[in-house]
Each structure stands twice: as structure tokens, then as C-alpha cells.
């Protein structure tokens, strides 16, 4: 249900990261935008872990609503928040992100020009000294350079920084909740959005900062889960369109592997290049795991 009161509803799914959530909410307080024109909906993806301590200091500073659900994954959490939202436009970010002060203002400018589009912004790694976090973001940057090379004909956004009309979100059914991991659900949503005949626009001036601390083990797990999500994504789009592309052209992978050399120099560049190779191994392992699990015994 939308109202004339709020132009934007910011949806933040969260799971057991109260300190990061507090930083995220603090960045909303600093937005250079009228406080009575947006609301914040935090969806706690757990009924067992309380986040009241992190949220309560912001209750009087923001139009903030806290919802809780049994642990079901970020896709379901985003839907829970979106279907309770009252704003004309939904804006999604994650609990480990902070937003630029002009975040909503830049979105308003974009929607004034293209009110029916999905608008995706730029994500900046906020932990440049963490090589695993840097590699993870550079992998996303490469995908953006590939899929969003033509800004007004974009194809893919991560769900930590995109916005769209609330009515259109509900019309296409929200996120696919069969994606239980934080992997593939945003890719599937973008594909379904485009498949419905709608348009997506890349707006790099719409900026968030990502504080995702990774270790080697966490990096592997993240990429492994991306592989699991990629398998489910391919299964899903195959049902949607018989001629759906299942394998990228070899040049996609070649350009991916050389991409780090265009971004950094020195030792970190070599480490990131090695992590790019490792990521493809982890993704392949995740795909094989899901393929095995989906095969009849």
C-alpha cells in the first residue's frame, strides 16, 4: 500500500549484524533529504536474535519500522519489507552498507526522468585494505562493466543498491523466495524485470559503501554460494525462456581474468588476480553441488 506521505521506502534485511546495522541506520540520519519524505523498514531475518539495541536509538530520528520473521533468507526478508512499505518507490540496501548523503536526492532526480524504470547504483568497497573484500567487489565491478556497459539498457544490479516503483515490484511478484541464500536472487529479479518488457538504468552517482569483511574462507564460501545461486538461476530462466543463454562466451571469462590488471598495480593486483581464479573454482564447485543435489537418486 502506497501513500502520498513517503516518496521512498528504504528496505534493509538484516541477520545478526547489529553493529553494522547501526552504522547503516546512522547513514540514513545523515541523508541530505527531507526526513518526512522517506521511511525505513528494517526486517530482522530471525525471531531468535534481537536487534532492538541497534535499532532503538534511531526510532526518534527516522520514520523507522522494525519487522521480524523466522529465518528465511534475504529474498523473503526484502519481500516482507516491500509489501509493508508505504512509499511510491522502494529502495533496497543491505545492513553492511552505508549510503552517500545525496543517495535519495540522486534517485529522485533519476525517477523524475524515468519513473517506470529499475535504477541501480554504484557500490564502493569500503575496506580497500582487505584484499578479499576488494576482490569480491572487483568481481561485481567486472559484471557491471559487462552487463551495464550501456547505462540506459542495463541488465544486472546487486540488491544492495537498487530502487524501483513499488507498484511494479508488486506487479511482478517481488523476489523469488526459492532463492534462500544471498546468491542469485537479485540476478533472477533483474532478468524477470527485463523479461516483462521493463527497462533498467545504471546510475553510478547513486552510491553506497560496502563494509563486507572477508577472510579467505569467507571469500570461498561467498563464491561457492554464488555458484549455487547461479545453478538455480539457470534452472529458473530455462523455464522462462527455452533459448535462455546458459554459458557465457569464452571472451567473458578471459576478460574477467585479466580485469584485475586494469584496476591495481603491485602485489595486491597479483593477489586479486589469483582470487579471481579461485572464485571461478568456487563457483564451479557450488554449481556442481547444486546439480548433484537436484539430481534424482
List the predicted regions and their residue ranges.
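N-proximal low-complexity "stem/linker" segments adjacent to membrane-targeting elements
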Residues: 1-30
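Acidic donor-binding segment of Leloir-type glycosyltransferases
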Residues: 25-68
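Glycine-rich, basic loop-to-helix element that forms the pyrophosphate-binding segment
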Residues: 53, 69-85
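Short aromatic/hydrophobic "clamp" motif used to bind/position activated sugar donors
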Residues: 90
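Donor nucleotide-sugar recognition loop
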Residues: 98, 155, 170-194, 198-202, ...
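Conserved donor NDP-sugar-binding/catalytic core segment of glycosyltransferases
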Residues: 102-133
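A recurrent flexible, glycine/aromatic-enriched loop bordering the glycosyltransferase active site
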Residues: 125, 145-167, 180-182, 188
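Non-catalytic, C-terminal membrane-associated alpha-helical segments of glycosyltransferases
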Residues: 225-228, 240-297
Amino acid at each position: 500500500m502506497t501513500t502520498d506521505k513517503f516518496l521512498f521506502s528504504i528496505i534493509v534485511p538484516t541477520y545478526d549484524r547489529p553493529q553494522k546495522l547501526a552504522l547503516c541506520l546512522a547513514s540514513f540520519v545523515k541523508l541530505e533529504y527531507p526526513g518526512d519524505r522517506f521511511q525505513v523498514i528494517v526486517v530482522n531475518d530471525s525471531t531468535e536474535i534481537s536487534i532492538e539495541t541497534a535499532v532503538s536509538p534511531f526510532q526518534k530520528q527516522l520514520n523507522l519500522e522494525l519487522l521480524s520473521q523466522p529465518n528465511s533468507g534475504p529474498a523473503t526478508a526484502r519481500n516482507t519489507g516491500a509489501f509493508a512499505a508505504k512509499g511510491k518507490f522502494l529502495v533496497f540496501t543491505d545492513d553492511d552498507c552505508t549510503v552517500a548523503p545525496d543517495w535519495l536526492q540522486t534517485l529522485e532526480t533519476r525517477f523524475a526522468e524515468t519513473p517506470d524504470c529499475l535504477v541501480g547504483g554504484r557500490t564502493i568497497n569500503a575496506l580497500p585494505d582487505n584484499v578479499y573484500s576488494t576482490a569480491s567487489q572487483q568481481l561485481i565491478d567486472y559484471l557491471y562493466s559487462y552487463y551495464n556497459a550501456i547505462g540506459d539498457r542495463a541488465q544486472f544490479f546487486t540488491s544492495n543498491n537498487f530502487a524501483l516503483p513499488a507498484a511494479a515490484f508488486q506487479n511482478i511478484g517481488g523476489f523469488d523466495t526459492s532463492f534462500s541464500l544471498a546468491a542469485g536472487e537479485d540476478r533472477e529479479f533483474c532478468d524477470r524485470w527485463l523479461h516483462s518488457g521493463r527497462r533498467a538504468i545504471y546510475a553510478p552517482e547513486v552510491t553506497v559503501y560496502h563494509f563486507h569483511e572477508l577472510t579467505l574462507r569467507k571469500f570461498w564460501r561467498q563464491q561457492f554460494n554464488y555458484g549455487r545461486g547461479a545453478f538455480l538461476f539457470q534452472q529458473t530462466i530455462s523455464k522462462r525462456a527455452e533459448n535462455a543463454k546458459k554459458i557465457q562466451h569464452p571472451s567473458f571469462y578471459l576478460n574477467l581474468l585479466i580485469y584485475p590488471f586494469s584496476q591495481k598495480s603491485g602485489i595486491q593486483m597479483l593477489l586479486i588476480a589469483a582470487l579471481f581464479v579461485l572464485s571461478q573454482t568456487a563457483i564451479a564447485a557450488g554449481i556442481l553441488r547444486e546439480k548433484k543435489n537436484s539430481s534424482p537418486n
